[in-house]
Amino acid sequence: MTEITDRYFNDVIARLSGLRDRLAAQMEKAADLIAAAARADRRVYVFGTGHSHMMAEELHYRAGGLAITVPILCGSIMLQDGAVASSHFERIEGAVRPILDRYGIRDGDVLVVVSNSGVNAAPIEAARYAREKGAAIIAPTSVAYSNTIARGRTQLLSLADVVLDNDAPSGDAVLEIAGSALKVGPVSTALGVTILNAVFADVAARLVGEGDAPIYLSANMPGSGDINRSLVERYRDRNPHL
């Protein structure tokens, strides 16, 4: 392993170790909200723009994941149809409401709004939309980054029921390169995925204990076909991506 790859591993491991203790109470609160939604046959929606949309894909139809999870996916806020355009789109006031209207978010649901910076128009509008519909809001975000760049703008962290601070630094990248002012090695995705999978694992453990755990199996595991088909039929009415 080279010196810089070693530094990257060490940085991510150190941040995850710190998050395990510092975020324990907040992760438990997030699990409380999601478990309550599951018991009430509600849904957990996951929204993010740019690279943050990967959290929605990570939790959707996932081996070991909850079938109540619904990703909010639209090419205009993702990267594959034009990264520059999507970066512009997420800053336009009112642009995401028509996207959210497709999903039928309602009272008792949970919306996970993922935004590392936590200040762009799209995640702010998504959180306000959820509040309007009576849904709870969980916000994985970087508090340090958001506080640095807010400059009087509304911050996602001020709108959420639960804030999951991912400890990513301003600008996301953590590694300095000798002889350059540039930084490389973004960490928000690695940290965010770990936080959310830990929360969802907590929820799953609670539901297993209560006798109703809608959890997908890997498609390559014996018996997965029948189990996954049953879950898809049960939950596809409110998940357009199944």
From Swiss-Prot:
Domain SIS positions: 30-214
One Gene Ontology biological process: carbohydrate derivative metabolic process
One MF term in the entry's GO annotations: carbohydrate derivative binding
CDD domains hit by this protein: SIS_RpiR
Signal peptide: none
Sequence similarity: Belongs to the UPF0309 family.
Name of protein: UPF0309 protein BSUIS_B0903
